[in-house]
């Protein structure tokens, strides 16, 4: 349930970004119902993991959208896609249950209408999803909510989940399908594993109380193993959960200060990526075996070391980790995954709230970054044009809209593009150059260990360790190159998390191994 799913209202200078929420605080607080397994059934005795099979019952949501068939069609396409990717991503051990009367589903999941033919669904499927389309709140800042409503009586594995989509989407916007798909992927994760009831069951959570402060951490073994590898910190023994934003965010999402960009933080930017760390949580539950190929798109905090957890994001008003954080409002900055463009976000909270003293990084104590990043200033999507505003993921390098202005010379939106911070313009240009975050087509030269950037008819070769190139043939201005190991170590190229799942067993040599610049 993507607790905060990005809607940005930006004016000038220091302003506040308001985020749409997922309705976790609207969820029922009683435990889910329980289903008993048959004893000694063939399906139960088969102890092998097999690809998950999911059944979606569209009975109620079709009724809810009776007067808007186009809305139903888009919801169905998006939910079918989201469930398809879970079937590719997760394997599960089979269980066998007694016949399931549809009235039990209606009662436990608070759904008025369930297909009466649901009795034997669990003979074939591992998970049932019941979607609805109901406005549960008087506000328009909530997108969706989800929870497990029936679990296995023995091991508490989720069997039936409900997801409610609220009518707060703009179904006429470009990219509505991929945006809905991403929201629903987040929501389904909540009733598969990332829900307080489920986390407590398999002892994934550790609670620490210091004074009046209560902090929740994930301490399960595979999560810690993957986190140690990603951050480069062998002594790491716990990973924080979100503690801001009330019930709708706290305790059911990763702490954005450390996991920004992962699809299970409480705010979505124009990037959503699956990390090995989140997949490890699925495995730690004991219910699932995940496919760990994620394309290496989660790049926030990669290889920084234990200091990432020991130091503040800003010291003396300067960013300690400049790849992750920033200290100049409106400064052009790529999102952490380099999947989208953005700028440094610093908001003025003076009339909104008092920033906790431990998160005050500026002399003006009312200035800070987004709430779910512990007010650390970081890159945030910023919509400059009407064409970008007409898109969900409007600043994404794969799905967004190019600005088509001279300062964005050479920009390409597409499936081989990443974000670069650049001020490059043609040398003949009479216009002054200035820094921008721009989407360029690029490739990873795995033979020579370099990044190649394509700007119209010219190629720019970035050094292995990255850094700022001050002189580029044919251009005036500069370009900041990311480290090769940050964006080019994956076996397969992808610049979108669902594409990464699709390519889990492929190798895209045309992108990676450059031979005489063919097919580029």
What are the residue ranges of the model-derived segments?
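Extracellular zinc-dependent metalloprotease catalytic-domain scaffold
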Residues: 18-182, 190-514
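Long, low-complexity intrinsically disordered regions of secretory-pathway proteins
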Residues: 515-520
């Amino acid at each position: 349930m993507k607790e905060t799913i990005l809607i940005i209202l930006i004016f000038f200078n220091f302003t506040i970004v308001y985020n749409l929420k997922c309705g976790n605080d609207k969820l029922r607080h009683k435990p889910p119902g329980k289903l008993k397994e048959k004893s000694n059934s063939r399906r139960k005795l088969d102890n092998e993991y097999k690809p998950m099979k999911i059944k979606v019952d569209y009975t109620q949501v079709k009724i809810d959208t009776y007067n808007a068939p186009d809305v139903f069609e888009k919801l169905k396409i998006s939910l079918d896609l989201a469930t398809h990717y879970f079937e590719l991503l997760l394997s599960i051990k089979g269980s066998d249950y007694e016949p399931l009367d549809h009235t039990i589903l209606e009662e436990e999941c608070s759904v008025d209408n369930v297909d009466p033919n649901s009795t034997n669904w669990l003979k074939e499927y591992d998970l049932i999803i019941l979607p609805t389309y109901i406005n549960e709140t008087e506000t328009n800042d909530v997108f969706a909510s989800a929870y497990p409503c029936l679990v296995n009586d023995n091991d508490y594995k989720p069997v039936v989940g409900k997801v409610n989509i609220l009518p707060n989407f703009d179904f006429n916007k470009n990219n509505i399908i991929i945006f809905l798909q991403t929201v629903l992927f987040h929501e389904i994760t909540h009733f598969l594993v990332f829900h307080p009831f489920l986390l407590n069951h398999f002892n994934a959570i550790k609670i620490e109380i210091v004074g009046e402060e209560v902090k929740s951490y994930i301490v399960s073994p595979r999560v810690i193993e993957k986190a140690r590898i990603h951050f480069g910190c062998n002594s790491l023994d716990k990973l924080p959960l979100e503690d801001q934003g009330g019930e709708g965010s706290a305790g059911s999402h990763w702490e954005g200060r450390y996991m920004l960009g992962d699809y299970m933080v409480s705010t979505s930017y124009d990037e959503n990526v699956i990390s090995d760390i989140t997949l490890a949580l699925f495995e730690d539950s004991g219910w699932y075996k995940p496919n760990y190929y994620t394309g290496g798109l989660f790049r926030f905090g990669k290889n920084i070391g234990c200091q990432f957890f020991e130091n503040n994001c800003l010291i003396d008003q300067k960013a300690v980790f400049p790849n992750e954080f920033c200290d100049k409002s409106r400064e052009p900055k790529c999102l952490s995954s380099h999947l989208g463009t953005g700028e440094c976000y610093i908001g003025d909270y003076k009339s909104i709230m008092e920033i906790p003293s431990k998160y005050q990084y500026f002399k003006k104590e009312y200035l800070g970054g987004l709430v779910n990043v512990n007010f650390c200033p970081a890159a945030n999507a910023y919509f400059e044009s009407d064409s970008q505003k007409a898109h969900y993921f409007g600043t994404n390098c794969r799905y967004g809209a190019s600005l088509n202005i001279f300062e964005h010379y050479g920009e390409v939106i597409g499936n081989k593009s990443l974000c670069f911070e650049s001020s490059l313009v043609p040398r003949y240009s009479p216009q002054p150059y200035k820094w921008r975050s721009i989407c360029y087509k690029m490739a990873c030269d795995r033979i020579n260990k370099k990044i190649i950037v394509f700007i119209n008819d010219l190629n720019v070769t970035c050094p292995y360790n990255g850094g700022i190139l001050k002189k580029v043939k044919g251009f005036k201005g500069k370009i900041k190159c990311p480290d090769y190991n940050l964006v080019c170590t994956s076996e397969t190229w992808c610049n979108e998390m669902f594409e990464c799942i699709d390519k889990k067993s492929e190798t895209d040599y045309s992108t990676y191994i450059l031979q005489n610049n063919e097919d580029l």
